[in-house]
Amino acid sequence: SVTGVQTCALPISHPTLDVTFFIMFSTLAAHVCYSLFMEGKMFRALVISTVIVAIAVSAVEQLLRIIGKWVSHRFLNDDRHGDPLSKVYALKKFVDQGWQLVYHCSFSLWEYLLLRKYNWFAGSVIWFSSEETVEAPYAIRLLFIAQISLWFFQAYRHVFVNQRKKDYYELFLHHIVTLSLCYYAQYGNYKLGLIILFLHDNSDIFIDLLKMLNLMKIDGPKDFFIIEIEYVVSLLVWIYERLYTLPITFMRDGIMVMLDHYKGLPMASIFRKEWVFCIEIGCLWILYGLHIYWFILLVRLGYRAFVSEPENIRNISKEGYEGDSDVESDDESPKKNEIGRASCRERV
């Protein structure tokens, strides 16, 4: 602040939500592990995948740390950019977002290749009733297992490692419903699940790039309006893939096909037969609600940054893209920021 006194605008903590979401995720994770263990075939893959994820993320983050420092010092060390990634927290956030970019690019490619291999872009039926015996191809089950291990890892870091941001609870809810969708999709409606995974991972690539460009302070005419163009592209991709294609996919190719399959049965009977699928559709509606919420935030951010307050674009972008609390500073060390947050908690 101007007076030098640190403001204490920490994200509000809700103990009831903390306990509820933690129990929900832990129970679901235990159920997933137990079910895979009892099945036997994929449990070993889950364990190996979780170990690989932990090692790979650590290696990717170390590489991104080196690359980020070098790029910032070599190409952005001027008066306008100010070597942005030389600051401790800016580099940390760049690395955190960078491994997300690597993850989303890798899995988008993996999912795309599987979709092409099995020709699921051709409009074939992608919903199966619970009465049908459907065995998902091993390659697809392996993909879902790898996704599950990543959601285990992300949830652990979200709760126990990362600093809480303003959308902490929204992201926690997102982790819960995504884990549920990944687990149940691998058994029955893996075709629908794979398409939905692809839509999510592919659209996240553009958001990752947007956040990383913002951390590097690449904006304006001298940087060829790169971040401004990326912002527009991110909005368009989000609208098409998450707000348009996603609901059409699970409504037209999921719900409507199910209702047609059980034509003449009352809804209560359909629910008894397909209660798992109905719950997963509920999870998809939760995801869709989160997509609308984040889209509104993204539009508001763009309006403030480019229309109403363009002179404060970097502060607005920092708050919006990165979700910082007011006690976090890019210029301070992690230890100083932790002290600042602790002093705020003592005064709350």
Residue ranges and their predicted role:
Residues V2-L10, R345-R347:
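Short, small-residue-biased leader/transition segments that mark boundaries at the very start
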Residues A9-K191, N214-I239, Y244-I286, I296-R341:
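Membrane-helix and juxtamembrane interface regions of eukaryotic multi-pass membrane proteins
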Residues I195:
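Classical protein tyrosine phosphatase
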Residues L199-L210:
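Alpha-helical transmembrane segments and their membrane-interface exit regions
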Residues K211, R242, R345-R347:
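Basic side chains
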Residues Y293:
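Catalytic cores of secreted or luminal carbohydrate-active enzymes
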